[in-house]
Amino acid sequence: MKLFPYAHATHPQWRMAAGLVLAQVRAQMVLHDYASAPTLALLYITDHYAQEAQAILDHLSAELPEVTDWAGTVGVGIASNNVEYFDEPALTLMLCELPSDQYRVFSGVAPLGLGFEAHTALVHADASTPELAGLIEEMALRTDSGYLFGGLASSRSSTVQFAVGGNGNIKGQGAAGGVFRGGLSGVAFGERVGLVSRVTQGCLPVSKAHRVDAARNNLVTELDGEPALDVLLRDLKVSLDQPEQALRTIRATLVGLMRVAEADGGASDAVAIGRSGNFGSDVLVRHIIGLDPARRAVAVSDQLEAGMQLAFCQRNVQAAKADLMRVCAEIREELEPEELPAEALTALAASEAEAAPHPARGIAGAIYVSCSGRGGPHFGGASAEMQIVRRALGDVPLVGFFAGGEIARNHLYGYTGVLTVFTSQDC
């Protein structure tokens, strides 16, 4: 599989940005190492362009008639190789060359048909969709692997998704032009599409993993046989006798949750919290939304069950950097061959200024979905998060967005990044 053409641009006028993007992908499509006949486009726009979503899709699809399938969404920020766009009008595009029988675009009005055997799926969703968590779990069950990746659209204006399949519109969507609001959409992939995906956490535990002994709905009343509020105050070393200090610390604290089945029986802290002191990829970070002093209970923004593991945590930039570098290194080590020809070694060893995507990395393209609360500003500077990805993963075609919640496996995460790469093995 050859490298996927990709591009990104910013401009106050969407037509100018689209023109810049089209020029970039067309220039790549004539290069030997890049795919020349892609049929699937992944399109992400910032919310500055949300009101023009239909016009953007119509224009790009008319300019790229050979690309018959489109998927994507809107974000308060978008990402590409080595760059992030926040609070400015921008778009990014990647063109994927995959066997036509190995992927299907779907949406709420044109769901995935029974005739396609999905192995995994890229999912975009609207956070306002009723029973969203259940829909994500149901979609995961539709795949052989049970693995989804993607995120929730994030926007300060219109929350839109792109989904166009086949020669024009998806069969069944009627007069809809490929821009949707609400529900789920995305791309399902067959088993011959090589994908490697990892979740990177952004929070650091500040307590051991506790066992939830008693809980009702989103209220936990007992941890390890003790009142949950007492455990929280002890772990954070604060007291309600000094309410201002206690509330300030608690507001900066979140909880990491793991279900018993995912925690291998919940027998050990090392399951939810690894030997490095970081959360495992199955831990879901949620907000503390209230305290109940009368019942000595803690309320969180998710449903709780007895037997779950719960650890208190806080956002930590250094831990987030280290974990992001770790997942990039894991993917790189898994895909790069042990022996490379001299030409490839020279290309991969090029300086950052001279670097360019190369097939020898084993990566045809990548999708990165990060939390809208992460990104460069959180990591210390403009585009800092994507610069970390480039240094650790290498120079690869990449697009993505900053989401209102990240999807991996059958879960909805927060404060994480989900990095997925298309391997360049032949389908």
Regions found by a protein language model. Give the residues of each.
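Small-residue-enriched flexible segments
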Residues: 1-50, 59-62, 67-366, 371-378, ...
